[in-house]
Amino acid sequence: MSDFVQQQNAVCQFSSSDAWVILSPIEQSIKRKIEAVGTPLKDWNINIYRGVLTGYNDAFIISTEKRNEILANCQTEDERQRTAELIRPILRGRDIKRYGYVENGLYLINTHNGIRGKIPRIRIEDYPSIKSHLDQYWDKIEKRADQGDTPYNLRNCAYLDDFSKPKIVWGNLNLKASFALVEDNSFINAPSPMIVPASNYLLGILNSKLADYYIRRLGVTRQQQFALRIG
């Protein structure tokens, strides 16, 4: 073992306070070349956000069948229309593929907590059918840490509007680079992240073999997959 270590050892120098990673000499050389000609994502005019945290997915993430049931239980056409607008498609990390995603038939009950000075929080009293559904989970949603002003509301989210914009999304755990463009108003379930505003140019770079190689060297191994952390 001692001879093997002496033969295979490599010196790694960490000259800054930035995050560091142990690489072979040739890997260090490749990393330096990429970073010398590339522009860090933090210097692009973009934002990287985490997906939605509900605190209790069983209550707030529902199937197509449950969505239809909630809408059918609305007492007026006005309530039905407002309720339909509040229930939005949501993607999970496992649904996201390279340049695309799988329609999963899942929806988020977006009883958001509003944005101060911009959007008022959802008042559950205005959505009786949704309230009836959530009341079935009261013991769970009332105790959860991630909640808004009331147990019916989701936690504060300052970038709520950005979920309605085109965005680049990816799963938190991947075997390879799998970035997709989502152009509709779908939400993303945490811990999956998203980039806004979206760019086809950036999407192509992130899905390239070079970016895949680079991110793999910096990613965190978990469950034989890579937690892709970019920024």
Predicted features, each with a name:
Residues 3-231:
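Polybasic, glycine- and aromatic-enriched phosphate-binding surface used to engage nucleic acids
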